[in-house]
Regions:
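N-terminal auxiliary segments of SAM/dcSAM-dependent transferases
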Residues: 2-60
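Conserved Class I S-adenosyl-L-methionine
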Residues: 15-19, 236-291
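Conserved SAM-binding loop of SAM-dependent methyltransferases across substrates and taxa
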Residues: 108-123
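Conserved beta-strand signature within the Rossmann-like core of class I S-adenosyl-L-methionine
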Residues: 188-198
Length: 291
């Protein structure tokens, strides 16, 4: 039986042609036992439990192991399941028998793993690459979801070859549209998920008493429309139950919870809502105007 390291190493080798040196952009070759070396001699080793660190230099982030453990618990509870089901349906509607799928801002990998599993269940052959600048998230993804190519990467300098992606997922994560345009195939598309006005309304109304109690994604969507051709927009809205024992994890994983004073957080934990509003916008965009 193969170890997680061996499974992930095999996946990275199989997807090597999709990757590019973050320093010079050259293609890689694999050198045993576990190194990617580009044509210019820049080398990157596969780290345990099976991910590759493809940054020019290390980056410090706010995202630590505790946050990603909390994120995994919340996602595993089914909180985002209706969103992921719809994301899968949209990709499956393209009727591709095989596709290359990048998750830009993959975190600890749960969303990508679920989408890949759903697509594979319909008979689609998926080559998947997860990218995130937070090493702790990527490390956890490699541990929990072996078989996908997990990379520590900067979305402003994606270590991937041009025109290789059929689909780029970008779920509640920052974007770099210049890089996304470079990575998309001519018939590929970006599937971006952003909050809508009522996302986590119950938390916002408790934490804020001013205009921050509501949210606008106008600046995000306007910027996207400037860079790519928007093909389709839809809204996914539902109420999701949240178990009391998961609420502390929820506050750990969402930026809304990072700025609550201790007294306010304790008050919230003593008066928990039974459900939270999930209100998200799915945007499908392509590079049609560039052709």
């Amino acid at each position: 039986m193969l170890s997680k390291m061996e499974i992930n190493k095999r996946a990275l080798k199989e997807n090597m042609a999709l990757l590019a040196c973050p320093i010079c952009g050259a293609a890689f070759e694999f050198r045993e036992p576990q190194s990617f070396v580009c044509l210019e001699g820049h080398g990157f080793d596969i780290a345990k439990p099976g991910y590759v660190h493809l940054l020019k230099q290390a980056h410090k982030t706010k995202y630590d192991q505790a946050l990603f453990e909390s994120r995994k618990k919340v996602i595993a509870s089914g909180f985002f399941e209706k969103l992921i089901e719809r994301v899968t349906e949209i990709i499956a509607e393209k009727k591709k028998e095989q596709l290359v799928l990048y998750d830009a801002g993959c975190g600890e990998g749960s969303h990508l793993a679920r989408v890949v599993s759903n697509l594979q269940a319909t008979g689609v052959n998926v080559k998947a690459v997860g990218l995130d600048i937070a090493k702790e998230g990527v490390k956890q993804a490699a541990r929990d979801y072996p078989g996908t190519s997990w990379t520590v990467a900067d979305l402003a300098n994606c270590p991937n070859q041009a025109e290789t992606a059929d689909v780029i997922l970008n779920i509640l994560s920052p974007s770099n549209y210049v890089e996304f345009k470079r990575l998309l195939k001519k018939d590929g598309f970006l599937l971006k998920v952003v909050p809508e006005a009522n996302y986590l309304r119950e938390l916002r109304e408790f934490i804020y008493v001013d205009e921050k109690s509501s949210y606008s994604n106008e600046s995000v969507t306007s910027r996207l429309a400037e860079k790519l051709s928007v093909e389709h927009v839809e809204r996914v809205t539902y109420k999701a139950p949240i178990a009391k024992e998961l609420f502390a994890d929820f506050l750990e994983m969402t930026p809304l919870g990072w700025h609550i004073e201790a007294d306010k957080k304790n008050e919230l934990l003593e008066n928990l809502p039974e459900e939270l509003t999930v209100d998200l916008q799915i945007i499908i965009a392509n590079r049609a105007h560039l052709l």
